[in-house]
């Protein structure tokens, strides 16, 4: 069976584990920078193009700072994510704020930072006016309804999604915003998740470019930018084909020229990729602590769904490598589990793998997006550390593991003698 490549080998990882006990997520700085540069190059034809990293994917200030240094802005959807941006010096048009069901304090904070706000609903116009005020630059999120297709393939059903303005609401919303003094408008849409079809962005782009042109003519406003949002997926399985980002950029260019050629419209293109940017650069490293043989063969690890929720929540596939046994026959079938009191706490089900022994190191791939960030504390489980594998091969702890003291910190009234014994 084809295995996925790793930026480290067993001997290197054993040295890392001496410094940072498992489980932990480790991120490959070199790969993150490479992906940011490839994306920027793919859209270099568009003057003013900018990627706004989806902070929700991996809300770590060190990872965010790496992407900031590569020219990326930040896409936020919550108060805490705005706080992270401010902490690393990303403010103003370095932030897009795309939220829904938005609390007043979030809008007010976004306005204080002068972030570019992407409105999710026509009723939010009046709400924002009352809580933060209407800026001169603003964006609106479009939901076309119906089915979203690429060719004959159905990629999603936007009509069921809770996000965005209808087409009629866009026209009315732009008119209201124009009357309130908005000078520069943006258009945004997100219609598919984890899509590896190279025609996803070009298809979405044609839809948005066409609507932008219509709005420009109907309302008489400047469409300053069009945000293709996120949605580009990654190859979770070894046999999956990765998105060809250079091809994608070239196809979006073709659509841009097709729709805007012969007009004076030259909107900037924005993207809000998260998974594509950091997903393949992250790995959950865990140690085998138990082996159980009943009706099935179970391998118990020191990690659990609290460290990586996607397999339990979505049934998502994440590739597993047994370090040091990459070339061994995959002649055993295992369920890889954690210790939560939930039967779905499994990283892999009926997975062909080499023979696994207690003490083996397992690497679970593609956890650099929606991995640590979706962690939780059910069953009293603690979130793991995060480690950066730097370009020079050294490592840096970029988030310590949670402690029981952290877990119980909100019980201000409770005296727990055991905590006094823990460091």
Label each region the model flagged:
Residues 251, 257, 264-423:
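Charged (often Lys/Glu-rich) extended helix/loop segments that serve as interaction or gating elements
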Residues 1-136, 175-179, 183, 217, ...:
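A charged N-terminal "starter" segment
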Residues 64, 87-88, 107-109, 128-132, ...:
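Short acidic, glycine/serine/threonine-rich loops at helix termini
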Residues 32, 56, 78, 110, ...:
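Conserved, mostly hydrophobic/aromatic
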Residues 59-62, 84, 103, 147-148, ...:
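Flexible loop/turn segments at secondary-structure boundaries
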Residues 76, 97, 119, 187-189, ...:
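Conserved beta-strand positions
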Residues 133-147:
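Glycine-rich, aromatic-flanked loop segments that form ligand/cofactor-binding clefts
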Residues 144-290:
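Active-site loop/helix belt of alpha/beta enzymes
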């Amino acid at each position: 069976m084809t295995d996925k490549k790793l930026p480290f080998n067993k001997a290197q990882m054993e040295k890392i584990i001496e410094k940072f006990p498992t489980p932990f997520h480790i991120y490959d700085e070199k790969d993150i920078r490479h992906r940011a540069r490839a994306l920027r190059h793919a859209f270099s034809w568009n003057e003013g193009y900018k990627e706004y990293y989806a902070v929700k994917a991996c809300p770590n200030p060190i990872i965010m700072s790496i992407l900031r240094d590569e020219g990326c802005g930040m896409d936020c959807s919550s108060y805490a994510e705005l706080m992270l941006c401010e902490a690393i010096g990303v403010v103003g048009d370095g932030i897009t704020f795309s939220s829904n069901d938005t609390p007043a304090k979030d809008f007010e904070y976004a306005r204080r930072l002068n972030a570019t706000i992407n409105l999710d609903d026509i009723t939010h116009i009046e709400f924002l006016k009352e809580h933060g005020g209407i800026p001169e630059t603003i964006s609106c999120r479009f939901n076309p309804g119906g089915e979203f297709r690429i060719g004959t393939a159905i990629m999603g059903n936007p009509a069921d999604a809770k996000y965005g303005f209808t087409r009629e609401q866009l026209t009315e919303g732009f008119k209201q915003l124009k009357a309130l003094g908005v000078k520069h408008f943006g258009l945004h849409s997100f219609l598919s998740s984890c899509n590896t079809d190279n025609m996803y962005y070009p298809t979405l782009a044609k839809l948005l470019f066409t609507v932008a042109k219509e709005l420009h003519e109907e309302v008489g406003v400047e469409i300053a930018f069009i945000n293709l949002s996120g949605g580009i997926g990654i190859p979770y399985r070894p046999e999956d084909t990765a998105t060809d980002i250079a091809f994608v950029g070239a196809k979006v260019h073709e659509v841009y020229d097709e729709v805007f050629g012969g007009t004076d419209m030259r909107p900037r293109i924005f993207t809000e990729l998260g998974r594509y940017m950091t997903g393949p650069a992250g790995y959950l490293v865990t140690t085998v602590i138990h082996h159980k043989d009943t009706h099935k063969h179970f391998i118990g690890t020191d990690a659990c769904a609290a460290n990586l929720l996607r397999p339990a929540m979505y049934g998502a596939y994440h590739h597993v490598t047994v370090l040091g046994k990459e070339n061994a026959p995959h002649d055993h079938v295992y369920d890889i589990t954690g210790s939560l009191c939930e039967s779905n706490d499994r990283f892999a089900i009926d997975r062909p793998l080499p023979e696994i022994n207690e003490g083996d190191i397992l690497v679970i791939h593609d956890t650099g997006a929606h991995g640590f960030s979706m962690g939780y504390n059910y069953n009293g489980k603690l979130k793991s550390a995060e480690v950066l594998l730097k370009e020079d091969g050294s490592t840096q702890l970029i988030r310590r593991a949670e402690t029981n003291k952290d877990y119980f910190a909100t019980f201000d009234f409770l005296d727990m003698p055991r905590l006094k014994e823990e460091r």
